[in-house]
Each structure stands twice: as C-alpha cells, then as structure tokens.
C-alpha cells in the first residue's frame, strides 16, 4: 500500500527508506547473527518498512506486530500478516501502557519462550532468542507521565524492567532496538557533561546503549541552544573512535558519514589517530575542510562557516567586498565597504574575538589538567619525598589557577570547568559518558529517509547482568539519591552531598574510591564536580548514605527525593 498525503501518519515519524534499513543491518549485522530465527516483538511498526527488512535478515520463527494506531497503519501491516504462511502476527494495543506487555506474556503470545521462575540464573542473562524493536519517535512530542516525552518514560521502564525481570524481560534480559527523536536519544546518551545526567547515569548502570544511526548535527550556534562540546574535544574523541573502527576493520559508507566521521576518515587516516590538534590547529583543519566543500556543520561555529562561504564567493566574484560610491565632486572616488564587505568585517572581528577567548580558556584548561595529573601522582606515588615536593608545587599551581580563573567573567569561568570536564571525560580510560565508550560512529540518516521529516535516531540497548546481591529496590534507592546529587552537576562533590542532608559531605571519607584515580577519583574535592561521578564512586556514595546513622529517616523511602523534587507528598513507606 502506498503512503500518500491523505494517509499522512500522525504523531509518529516513519522510516521510509529500505536502503537506510539495509545499511543499518549491514553495519550491525555481525551482532545480529546471534538472533537468527528468534522471536521478535515489534512495537509500533507503523508502515512496516523497518520491520520487513529486519524480518528478512533474521528470518524469525515468530514476529509480533504490536500497533497502537491501527487507524493509520493497519492496512500496511495486514499486507505482512495476511500473506500465506506468514510468521507475522498483528496485535492492537496501547504501547504506552505497560500492562499491555504483561498481557502478551500471560496470553502466551510467545509460545517458544519460557517464563523463568525467581532465582533462575537465566533471568540475569541475555536471552538471544527474543529481540525487541520499536518506534517512539513522536513528533510533535507526546508527553509521558513524569517525563517530558512518552519515549523517555517507556525506555526508562523497559530498562529498569530488565533488572526486575518484568515485561518481556521475564524470559531473561532482552536486547532492544528502538527508534526515538534525537532529543530523546541525546537525553538518554548525553554527548557532553553539561547535559542532564540523572536518568542517563541509571541507564548506564543497567544497560549498554549505542547510537546506531542519527541525522546530521545541528548548526553550532552561540547560546544555550548551541551548547555542545568544544570542537577540539569533539575531534579528539572522534580520533579515538576512528582508531577503534580501524582495529575492528569497520568502515562507514561514504554516503552515511556526517561531518565528524568525514573529518576522521580524511584527516586521521593520514595522521596519528590519537592526535590532539590544539585550539588553533583544530580550527584551521576544520576551515580547510569547509573550504574544500565538505560541510563541517555541527563542528565549525556557524559564524566561521558564514565567513568562509562569504570569502569564497567574494574570491569568485559572486559578491563584492568593496563598491565605488558615486560622487559629484571632481575628486577621485574611493572604494568603500559593500553590505557584504561590512558583514565580512564584522564576522572576522567576531570570530577572532571568539578564537582569542577559546585560546585563553584552553590555557586554563591545560593548567587544570596539569593540576589533575599532579593530584593523581600524589595519590599513587609511594615516594614520600616525591609526594611532599609535588604537594608544594600543587599549592603554587592551585593559587595561580584560582587567580587567573577569577579574573574571567562568570560565563567564561563556567566554560573553563565544562571544557576541562569534557576533556577529562574523553581522555580518561573510564569514559564517564556512555557516548565516549562507543567503538563506532552512528550512520547518517538523510532528511528524506524519515517521513514526515523529523530528527530521528536508532538506539541499541542491551541490559547488563545485575550485580550479585543487588536487589531492584537497591536500584530504586540509587536512582532516587542521584536526584539531589546531580540536580546541579556543576556543584563540587561536597556541595552536592550537602544538598542531600546537612553534614552529608562527611560521607566523602567513607568512600575510598573518591580519591582513587583508577576509579575516577581525585585529591581535591573542590575541583571534583558532581557531574563527573561515575561507577564505583556513585555506588559507594549511595551505600555510605544508606548506612549513615545521621540520615533523615524519611529518606529511607526509595522515592523520597523524587517526591521532594516534584512537590508530591508521600504518606506511605513501602
């Protein structure tokens, strides 16, 4: 059945490119092989193009099509389910109601699956005989309950259900390939330490999440909407990924490369893949690529791209930098700046000033990194003399750093902290963000491959085994305590702990990992911001707080801080 304007889908954007589906399947095909002949639960399949391409590759023994909007998509899906001998089965249900998934299991819609009993070790293992895929790419956004979007609510429940073995995870942990808007994708997998991290930290604890495909990056503009990593750090992270892809023999087709991937293939293919190009070097390299006709949208600031384009057009004679103003006197007319010339002059001034500020901040970030490395030495060296000498140098360097940083305005001070934290996130082997753990870059989705056109991404979520002795109630406590700790990620660790309860900063001494560089710790807690807390450190802080005798008794409820943040009064204590 053809998709036309009279049948324009409402709410959910549809994947309309078989070529995109084929490219995705070819890209992640090796990891899909273990799901051959599995059962598929396909949530909100829509017009079914992604569904049919995935089906053709996996040849599943059963394929449940669970559609929530049959008034739009039933004719498309019946073309699949009504074929003789079809393994498809079309079911109608509310995909935002989690009881729908429980009913599927209770009704025996997966006869090849076995619901496991409590205590069965397979509950904590990946079940490769079932694969979940689906789409919650609503545009405009469909709000969720307690979440800004339905996708975030559903993905949150899907992930947490893995460790409680609810929904389809009753058969063991299930891999999920889920479509969402890029806003939701980047909420779940942040690309900078400045982005909200409360739920992403929980998700990182429960699942490994990869971005398989995404659209072109938005233009890099100034202000809150343009908030992103410094392009120097972006390039350094991309170099690491490019090296990993080379080791794995993985290459993205040319037509699926975004600006970051294009740069990595063209530049790091010739130079050392772990290159830090520096502030000016990064800018010069990106400008050169832009001049060669390779769009660096999302990496180069838009004002720089505009300057490059204007200079190119003036050089080709398409525009004029100067014009001759007619005069009535006998004096020789002088050339004056044209409208384009004035714009170019303003852009050059603006971009030079911005680059000067970048260089100034970078020098301070270099000093902050030097301080961090010296702290790591103090914490790890066995030489008492070396420790004493380094501490003395640290005192001097810290004083210099504080003076120089305080000379900046508040915005630039904040940017120095952000750029240092992002640099550390990329360079640390711990990789504090899930995004920095990626071993491959996402494929590029073109505008005409999603209809109606919207910014859509594909996520690959695979549950991790739940640590022995950790209950799902422990996970709820963990999620709840993250709320005050990460409410303002730019606060220092002592400040963030103080927001949990008065005196809670003393918990620092109960968590040795906080001062273990191998686990993400450092010496000076006043330089350690809450957004950099990860892994064993967060686990240790949660454990220390729950065992702290001075904690307010009401915080024993696993949803206390959630209720406080939303203004909800709780009367029960489960």
Language-model regions: role of each:
Residues 1-472:
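Catalytic cores of RNA-modifying enzymes
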Residues 2-3, 412-418, 427-434, 444-574:
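C-terminal target-recognition/interaction regions appended to catalytic cores
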């Amino acid at each position: 059945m053809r998709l036309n304007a009279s049948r324009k889908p409402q709410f959910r954007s549809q994947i309309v490119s078989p070529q995109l589906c084929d490219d995705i399947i070819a890209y992640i095909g090796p990891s899909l092989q273990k799901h051959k002949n599995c059962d598929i639960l396909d949530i909100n399949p829509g017009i079914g193009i992604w569904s049919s391409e995935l089906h053709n590759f996996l040849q599943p023994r059963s394929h449940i099509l669970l559609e929530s909007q049959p008034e739009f998509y039933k004719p498309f899906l019946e073309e699949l389910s009504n074929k003789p001998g079809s393994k498809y089965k079309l079911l109608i249900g509310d995909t935002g109601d989690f009881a729908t998934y429980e009913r599927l299991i209770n009704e025996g819609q997966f006869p090849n699956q076995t619901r496991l009993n409590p205590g069965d070790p397979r509950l904590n293992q990946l079940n490769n005989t079932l694969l979940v895929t689906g789409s919650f790419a609503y545009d405009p956004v469909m709000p969720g309950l307690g979440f800004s979007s339905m996708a975030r609510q559903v993905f949150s429940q899907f992930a947490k259900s893995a460790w409680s073995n609810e929904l389809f995870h009753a058969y063991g942990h299930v891999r999920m390939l889920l479509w969402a808007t890029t806003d939701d994708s980047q909420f779940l997998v942040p690309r900078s330490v400045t982005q909200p991290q409360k739920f992403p930290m929980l998700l990182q604890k429960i699942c490994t999440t990869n971005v398989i495909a995404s659209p072109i990056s938005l233009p890099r503009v100034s202000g809150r909407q343009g908030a992103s990593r410094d392009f120097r750090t972006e390039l350094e992270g991309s170099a690491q990924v490019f090296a990993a892809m080379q080791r794995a023999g993985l290459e993205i087709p040319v037509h699926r490369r975004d600006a970051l991937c294009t740069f990595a293939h063209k530049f790091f293919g010739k130079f050392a893949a772990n290159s830090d190009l520096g502030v000016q070097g990064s800018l010069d390299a990106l400008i050169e690529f832009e001049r060669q006709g390779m769009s660096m949208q999302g990496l180069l600031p838009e004002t720089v791209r505009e300057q490059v384009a204007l200079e190119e057009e003036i050089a080709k004679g398409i525009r004029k930098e100067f014009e001759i103003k007619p005069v009535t006197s006998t004096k020789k007319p002088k050339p004056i700046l044209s409208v384009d010339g004035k714009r170019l002059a303003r852009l050059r001034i603006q971009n030079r000033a911005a680059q000067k500020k970048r260089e100034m901040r970078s020098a301070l970030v270099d000093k902050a990194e030097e301080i961090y490395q010296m702290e790591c030495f103090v914490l790890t060296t066995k030489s008492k003399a070396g420790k004493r000498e380094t501490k003395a140098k640290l005192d001097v360097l810290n004083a210099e750093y504080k003076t120089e940083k305080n000379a900046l305005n508040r915005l630039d001070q904040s940017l120095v902290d952000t750029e240092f934290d992002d640099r550390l996130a990329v360079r640390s082997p711990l990789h504090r963000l899930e995004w920095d753990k990626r071993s491959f870059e996402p494929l590029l989705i073109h505008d005409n491959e999603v209809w109606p056109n919207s910014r859509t991404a594909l996520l690959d979520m695979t549950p991790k085994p739940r640590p022995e002795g950790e209950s799902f109630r422990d996970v709820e406590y963990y999620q709840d305590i993250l709320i005050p700790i990460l409410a303002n990620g730019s606060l220092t660790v002592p400040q963030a702990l103080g927001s949990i309860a008065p005196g809670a900063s003393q918990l620092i001494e109960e968590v040795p990992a906080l001062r273990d560089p191998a686990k993400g710790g450092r010496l000076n807690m006043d330089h350690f911001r809450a957004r950099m807390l990860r892994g064993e450190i967060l686990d240790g802080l949660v454990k220390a707080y729950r065992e702290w005798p001075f904690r307010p008794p009401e915080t024993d409820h696993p949803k206390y801080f959630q209720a406080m943040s939303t203004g909800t009064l709780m009367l029960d204590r489960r």
